[in-house]
Structure formats: C-alpha cells, structure tokens
Amino acid sequence: MAKKKKTVASNGIAHIHATSNNSIITITDINGNAITWSSSGAIGYKGAKKKTPYSAGVAAEKAAKEAMAMGLSTIKIYVNGVGRGKETAIRSLAACGLTITEIHDVTPIPHNGCRPPKKPR
C-alpha cells in the first residue's frame, strides 16, 4: 500500500541544536509540532566525523528537502548551542531553496550561575 503524502503549512521553524559532538536539525510547524528532523549521527557519521561542520550541513540539507517535499517554503531559524555546525547548517537550509525570514540565537548564557566543570588537562 502506498504511503499517504503529508502536507503542511508553507511556513515553519527550524531548530538547530549544535553541540560539541553532534548537530541536530528539527523542522517544525508554527505550533511546534515536528515535521521532520535529521542529525549528523542519523545520516551515518560516527565518532569524530559527527562534529564536523560538513556533517551538519548535510543533515540540514536532508531535513530541508524532506520539509520542502511536504510543502514548506519559508522558515524562521532558532540556533541553540556552541557547536561548529551552526553556520554551515544555516547556509545549507538557505541553499536548498527555503526562504529564511528570521535567525535567532537562543543559546542559554548564564549571568554567573552554576560553577562550570573543570577543564580537561
């Protein structure tokens, strides 16, 4: 039996979570319901290759193509984290043909809250 094609509204939100070990891209509708997602690990990269900006770009490209197939055309981008794949993921979303209206950096920054963990030697 053929799979039913899902359609969504033309605008949505892309959440980019860039950690030091992986990059996760989730595309949602305006209400926050997930449309599609992808990550460096889900594509097939393992270990140190997941950290690279290239893998974040490939993951963003995969998520964007799936979302565009469902009818998405414009997005707002919320970036979270300090990983290396943030900028590449944004560029990949734009290169796929999605129109970007806003970019927000929502990385939590403490106003001298908890003591950070000690640095590795």
From Swiss-Prot:
InterPro entries with a match to the protein in the record: Ribosomal_uS11, Ribosomal_uS11_bac-type, Ribosomal_uS11_CS, Ribosomal_uS11_sf
GO molecular function list: rRNA binding; structural constituent of ribosome
Xref: Pfam families: Ribosomal_S11
SUPFAM superfamilies on file: Translational machinery components
GO BP, sorted A to Z: translation
Keywords per UniProt: Ribonucleoprotein, Ribosomal protein, RNA-binding, rRNA-binding
One term under GO cellular component: ribonucleoprotein complex
Highest rank taxon of the organism: Bacteria
Function recorded in the entry: Located on the platform of the 30S subunit, it bridges several disparate RNA helices of the 16S rRNA. Forms part of the Shine-Dalgarno cleft in the 70S ribosome.
Assigned protein family: Belongs to the universal ribosomal protein uS11 family.
Quaternary organization: Part of the 30S ribosomal subunit. Interacts with proteins S7 and S18. Binds to IF-3.
Name of the protein described by the UniProt record: Small ribosomal subunit protein uS11
